[in-house]
Amino acid sequence: MSSINTRTRLPARKALFMAVAFAVSHPFLFASNAKADSDTMVTAPVPVTANPLGAGSDEMVVPVSVLSGRELSLSRESTLGDTLRTMPGVSATSFGPNASRPVIRGLDSERVRIMQNGVGILDASSLSFDHAVGIDPLIIEQIDVVRGPAALLYGGSAIGGVVNAIDHRIPKEQLDGITGRGEVRFGGAEDQKSGAIVLDAGNGLFAIHADVYERKTNDMDIPGYAVSSRKNREDGTPREHRGRLVNSASRADGGALGASLTFDNGYVGLSYSGHDNKYGVVAEEDVIIDQSTDRWDLATEFKDLGNIINRVKFRIANTDYKHVEIADGNPETRFSNRGNEGSLEIGHGNIGKLSGAIGFQFQDSKFAAIGDEAFVPKNQTQSRGVYVYEELPASLVNADDLKLSLGGRVDRVDVDSKGGDRFGPALSRDFTPKSIAAGALFKINQQWSVSGNLSSNQRAPSYFELYANGPHIATGQYEVGNTDFDIERSRGVDAQIRWKSGKHAFNVGAYHTRFSNFIGLFSNGLMFDEDGVVDPAGELAGADFEQVKATFTGLEADGKFRIYEGRGDLDLTLRSDYVRARNRDAGEYLPRIAPLRLGWGLNYSFNRFGTSLDVLHGFKQTKVAENELPTDSYTSVNATATWLLPTTTRLEAFAKAYNLLDDEIRDHTSFLKDIAPQRGRSLLIGLRGEF
C-alpha cells in the first residue's frame, strides 16, 4: 500500500520541527536559568479525572485507574484502545491495528467519553469502529480511566466511563530551564518505525511547549489465517492471506505548539495541535482512510483565591476534524466534525466542612458525511449543562474516617438533522437529561477502606441513533435509527474494597447497572442491498437501533505484591475482570461483551536492569447475541526488558516481545474478530531518553 506512505501535510510538520529547534537553540529567552536543575524540572502530577477537588485515586469514591510515567511508556501502543485494553474492566473495539476505542465494562461508542485534557474529542470514532480516535499515544503523558458512570461531571455520554488523555501542551507549572523527552521504536508485528520528541522550556513566568511525532507501519503479521475456522465453517468464507493482515499498514504524524503565562497560583495558556493519520481499513482490502485534525485549546486555572471562591478553571477547544475514505485510489465518502467544547468550573471554600464545585459545560458540533456510503445526514448537536459536586468529611469510628459525596447535573441537548433524499425532511429533537449520584468512602484503618456509589443517569440519544439510515460498510449492515427515541435511563450501584500495606496492594470491585431503555443496534433478520431494498441475496444485514431493558453486572480485581527484596526487587501482579450483559426484553445476551479474563505478571528490577513477564488468559465466550459467533479462548504472553544506559542523560533501551506463544487471539469485543486477529509473535525494540 504505497499510497499510505505518501506525506500529506509536510509543511505543517516542518514548521513544528523548526519551532522545536527554535525553543532549544535560543537560550536567551530563558536566561534566568539556561541549564535546568533536574530537581526543579519534575512536573507536578495532574490530579486524576472524576473529582473536581483534586483527590488522589485512593481517595476516590468511583474506581479510577491512572497510567503515567514509565508504566505508560512501556504500555504505549499505536491506538488508545490497545494501550488500555489489558486494564481490569477495559477492553477495546480492535478494528485492526489502526482503529481501536476503549470499551469500559461492556459499554462503548457514545457511552465512553474520550477527552483530551478534560475537553471532549470531536472526531468520528464513536460513529463507526473503523474511524480512529484523533489522539496519538506517543505524546500522552498520563491517562486517567474512570470505570463506571461519570455522567455527573461529564454528561450522559460518560454513562459507561471516561478516558482522559493528558498532555502538557499547555504548560501549567512554573518552569525555569529546558526539559524534554524523546523516544524511537522499531519492529513489532507491523514493522513499526516511530518516534516522538517532547520539549518544554520556561523562564519562571513564560513557558512554551513543542512536540512532534511520526509513525509508519506495514501490514501486520498474524498467526495463521485472517479468517477464523469458525467463520469458514459457518458461512464458507475462504481462509486466505496466511500470516498477514492485508491492508493494515498506516502512517501517522503530527505535533503541537503551546505557551503559557505561569504564576504561583495558576496559569493562562494556549496551544495548537495537528494530527494526520492515513491507514488501511482491514475490513476492505482496497479502502484507505485519510484523517486529519486541527485543534486549538485555551485553558486557565487559578487556585487559592479566597474563602468564598477558592478556585476557577476554564477550558475550551476548537476542533476541525475531517477524513476521506478512498477506494481503489478514488475519494468516495467524506466526513467532517467541526465545533467547540468547553467548561467553566468554580470551586468554593469550606462551608463548615463542606467543600465542592459548581460547573457549566457546553458543546456545539456540526457533523457531515457526504458520499454514496454516508449513512447519517448532516447534523448539529448542541448541549449545555450545569452540575454541582460536594464532599463532606464525617466521623463514624475515628475522626474524619468517612467521606460523603453528592452531586447532580442537568443538561439541555438539541440534536438537529438537516435531512436529505435518504433521510427525509429536516428534523429537530431536544432532550433534558438529569443525573444524580451519591457515594461514600470509609477508611476502616490505615490499610483497609471500602467505598460505594449510587447513581441515576440519563443520556440523550446521539445523532446516529436517531437519524441513521443507510449502508454501513465497515460493519456489513444496513443501519436504521429511530427519531422517536426517549432519553436513555439507567441506575447503577458500584462498590469496592481496597487494601494497601507497604509495597502490597489490591482492589476488588463489583457493579450492577440497570437500563430501563438501553439503546442498542440489533439485527432485524433481513438482508439488504446498498440502496436499502430488501434482498435475500443482499450483502448487508439489516440492523435497527432499538430501546430495550438491559442489565450489566460485573467484577474487577487487581493487586500488586512484593514477593522478594535482596539482589533486586520482584513483584507479582494479579488482575481479573468479568461482565455479563443481557437484553431483558428478549432474554438474550448483548453483543460484543468481553469474556472472563485472568492475568498475572512478574516484574523484576535490579540496578539498571529490569524485566517483566505478563500473562493474560481470555476464556471462551459462548454467551453470545443472535447472529453472533462464539469466540475461542486465548492466552497472551508478553515480556519486556529494559536497560538504563550509564550516561549523564537518562537513556533507557527497551525490548518488548509480544504473543510469545504465537496464539490466535481474537477479541470478542471486535466487529472484526473473525477476520482480523491480534498480532503474532514479534519483537519491538526502542530507545527512550529524558533530560
Label each region the model flagged.
Residues 248-252, 265-312, 317-339, 372-380, ...:
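Flexible loop and strand-edge segments within Gram-negative outer membrane beta-barrel domains
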Residues 247-248, 339-346, 387, 482-486, ...:
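Outer membrane beta-barrel strand-and-loop segments of large Gram-negative receptors
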Residues 354-356, 395-398, 404, 511-515, ...:
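Gram-negative outer-membrane beta-barrel transporters
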Residues 42-75, 101, 109, 119:
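N-terminal periplasmic "start-of-domain" segments of outer-membrane beta-barrel proteins
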Residues 223, 514-517, 521, 620-623, ...:
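C-terminal beta-signal and adjacent terminal beta-strands/loops
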Residues 180-183, 187-190, 194-291:
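Periplasmic-side early beta-strands and strand-to-turn transitions of outer-membrane beta-barrels
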